[in-house]
Amino acid sequence: MLLGLEQEFFVIPKEIYEKREDLKFAGRTLVGSPPPRNQQLGEHYYGRIPTIVEKVLSEVESELLQIGIPFKTRHNEVAVNQFEVACICDEAGVAIDQNMIMM
């Protein structure tokens, strides 16, 4: 059985992260505000990955390839500063192991 897994995550600048007690202590957003109205798809899902994030993802891809985990895709996700990476489909056991290492 082949399986293709993906990881979705947010990229938050360190200076903003350091100011957010909820992120530092709980590892997730506990306080916030509603999303802005009329978000355009071109601003996130179909938008260009910011250069600094592209650099980080290239470094991650390089590290994964060195340990034998082939990287298939990377792109923006629906929320602002949300991104996705996915490995190439593989046998279920291998794909699960690769996904756990990627996390």
Residue positions per predicted region:
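Glycine-rich, acidic/polar active-site loops that bind/position phosphate-bearing ligands
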Residues: M1-M103
